[in-house]
Amino acid sequence: MDHDHMHGMPRPSSSSSSSPSSMMNNGSMNEGGGHHHMKMMMHMTFFWGKNTEVLFSGWPGTSSGMYALCLIFVFFLAVLTEWLAHSSLLRGSTGDSANRAAGLIQTAVYTLRIGLAYLVMLAVMSFNAGVFLVALAGHAVGFMLFGSQTFRNTSDDRKTNYVPPSGCAC
């Protein structure tokens, strides 16, 4: 097999697999020709376990307590995302729709919601099954509390029909 197209990447030896995850795991992949070797395996499929990195380098580490804190953090991030998605702050006011201050507040809240949604998405991209499940649970609880009819007064006509929020539903 011709490896000339790999431009600076080491040729895989016959004893090791040439998949990206095995190259990272074996420490044979370097960055930009330097001598820095990756220490953490980057998963490409879902896995179970507390030894993972979520959002930040080295976090939560290998501690069970920090992993539990990470799961709680992702759960509440997803709940907060749902709260912002269904908040009355994003709905236009019925009185003065041309109010620029209200428009700026709506834009800021929308931007915050999208940023939080992307953080949840990036956390799930750690491919840790526990993180994935708590993100789903957080979105489900958040929707049940703030988006569904479960805890709403049905006499409020404005909130009886669910309209999915626009933008990223990560």
UniProtKB/Swiss-Prot annotation:
The keyword Ion transport applies. It is found in: Membrane. Pfam families: Ctr. GO terms for cellular component: membrane. It is a multi-pass membrane protein. Expressed in the root apex, lateral root primordia, embryo, trichomes, guard cells and pollen grains. Keywords: Copper, Copper transport, Ion transport, Membrane, Transmembrane, Transmembrane helix, Transport. GO terms for biological process: copper ion transport; pollen sperm cell differentiation; root development. GO terms for molecular function: copper ion transmembrane transporter activity. The chain crosses the membrane at residues 65-85, 114-134. Belongs to the copper transporter (Ctr) (TC 1.A.56) family. SLC31A subfamily. Copper transporter involved in copper acquisition and transport in leaves. Required for copper homeostasis and normal plant growth and development. This is Copper transporter 1. The gene is COPT1.
